[in-house]
């Protein structure tokens, strides 16, 4: 199962509308086919990562019943977050 928190939606709402649409499509694909190669769904250090188009990523953490997605943003921001 995949979950989001309030913080995720704050980041999501700051995205351009076209990226929000890509994020929505990526989420639907993640629910039905997490192994789809376009998602690049993988564990990176302590986080789970999924691709949202070419220049955006989302990060989550593993929780009891699945993954809690807490962040979405640019690949540059993603690189900074995963390096911490």
Question: Model-found features: residue ranges?
Answer:
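Tryptophan-centered motif/residue detector
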Residues: 9, 27, 48, 69-71
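Short, charge- and proline-biased low-complexity linear segments
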Residues: 21-30, 76-84
């Amino acid at each position: 199962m995949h979950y989001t928190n309030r913080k995720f939606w704050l980041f999501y709402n700051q995205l351009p509308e076209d990226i929000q649409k890509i994020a929505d499509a990526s989420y639907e694909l993640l629910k039905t086919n997490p192994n789809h190669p376009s998602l690049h769904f993988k564990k990176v250090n302590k986080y789970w990562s999924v691709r949202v188009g070419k220049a955006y990523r989302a990060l989550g953490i593993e929780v009891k019943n699945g993954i809690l997605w807490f962040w979405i943003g640019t690949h540059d921001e993603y690189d900074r977050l995963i390096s911490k």
